[in-house]
């Protein structure tokens, strides 16, 4: 299906954050028209562990986008582009068929604290930073 972007009128911004997903609709002059937000559950399976259900994340993104589009009766062909931000260094794994293997490990999780301290003690923190462009966390954060 061919979409003529010159006839399109809207931009969508998706902010998939640590506690909720938000979608914001802008007109072609970048004036905010409306927004939708949906929170999702935080899982704390043990002290220092923070996880999210990937399906809840995905559903919250879909719900917010669908809601703002239906609220203003906008078709996908009316959308010029979509920008997406996400929640820092949260990680999740999929199998080769795209099935989620487990809950997402949230950036606030402290299960790697001991490993990060070992890297610092070995003096290879700068090497880790050169690969990731992230500082090693202190106490897991």
Residue ranges and their predicted role:
Residues 122:
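Structured, solvent-exposed acidic/aromatic patches
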Residues 2-103, 113-114:
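N-terminal glycine/serine-rich phosphate-binding loop of ATP-dependent small-molecule kinases
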Residues 132-138:
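Conserved small/polar residues in nucleotide/adenosyl-binding loops
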Residues 115, 119:
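Active-site metal-coordination/substrate-binding segment of hydrolases
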Residues 109:
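Carbohydrate-associated surface elements
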Residues 125-131:
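Short glycine/proline- and acidic residue-enriched helix-loop micro-motifs
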């Amino acid at each position: 299906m061919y979409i003529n972007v010159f006839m399109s009128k809207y931009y969508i911004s998706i902010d998939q954050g640590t506690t909720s997903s938000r979608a914001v609709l802008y007109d072609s002059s970048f004036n905010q028209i409306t927004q939708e937000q949906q929170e999702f559950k935080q899982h704390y399976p043990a002290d220092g562990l923070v996880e999210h259900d990937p399906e809840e994340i995905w559903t919250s993104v879909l719900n917010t986008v669908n809601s703002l589009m239906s609220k203003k009766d906008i078709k996908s062909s009316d959308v010029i582009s979509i920008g997406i931000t996400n929640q820092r260094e949260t990680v999740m794994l999929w199998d080769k068929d795209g099935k989620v293997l487990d809950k997402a490990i949230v950036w606030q999780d402290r299960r790697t604290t001991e490993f990060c301290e070992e890297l610092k003690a070995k003096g290879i923190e700068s090497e880790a930073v050169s690969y990731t462009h992230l500082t090693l966390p202190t106490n897991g954060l």
